[in-house]
Design a protein with these regions (language model features):
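Macrodomain-like recognition of ADP-ribose-binding/processing modules
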Residues: 1-194
Length: 194
């Protein structure tokens, strides 16, 4: 098992697959999702973009905590794993004190499930390497310090022989990944097993 943490643009990754932090309708969105769809269009033209959009439409829906796979149609990574994490409905970051509420812990479990689903899809498709961004930490608003703990712990426990690259475009997310688990993040989880 190899887990690396890097900063950069996920669309340039040359692993077997990259992960799209997707919405449940698998529609083109903002953040990482928008960057991936945009890169497919830039590199492969309108046809590749339409193929990706159609592949997502054909799948139709992916529930929170799960993941599905499509070809990338134009990127260096041949596949895109679309993982749906939870939309954070918990307290705002400045109001977030330990321990997390039962509803917030449910969202922790959903996020852990999304990371597990990515690794399951890799195994099902014989993929040996994957690049994963922060799932749910952008417009879905999941606290980055808690998300970093989940990402690292799930990948360390379950990646097996899959090479995992946890990637961040932003400095603050990169710091959270590199320093996780922090005492503050662990206190919020209060021993919760996901």
């Amino acid at each position: 098992m190899t887990i690396t943490i890097t900063q950069g643009n996920i669309t340039y990754s040359k692993t077997d697959a990259i992960v799209n932090a997707a919405n449940s309708g698998l529609r083109e969105g903002g953040g990482v999702c928008g960057a991936i769809f945009g890169a497919v269009k830039k590199l492969g033209g309108l046809k590749a973009h339409q193929q990706l959009t159609q592949a997502c439409r054909d799948i139709g829906h992916c529930p929170t905590g799960d993941a599905v796979i499509t070809p990338s149609f134009a990127l260096a990574a041949p596949f895109i794993i679309h993982a749906v994490g939870p939309v954070w409905n918990g307290r705002e970051k400045d109001e977030l004190v330990a321990p997390l509420t039962p509803q917030e812990l449910k969202q922790v479990d959903e996020l852990a499930s999304a990371y597990r689903a990515v690794l399951r899809v890799c195994r099902e498709n014989n993929l040996k390497s994957v690049t994963i961004p922060g799932i749910s930490t952008g417009i879905f608003g999941f606290p980055k310090n808690v998300a970093a703990i989940i990402a690292k712990q799930v990948c360390e426990a379950e990646a097996g022989d899959i090479e995992v690259n946890l990637i961040s475009y932003e400095d603050d997310s990169l710091i959270e990944l590199r320093t996780a688990p922090t005492a503050e993040g662990l206190a919020l989880l209060n021993g919760h097993q996901f």
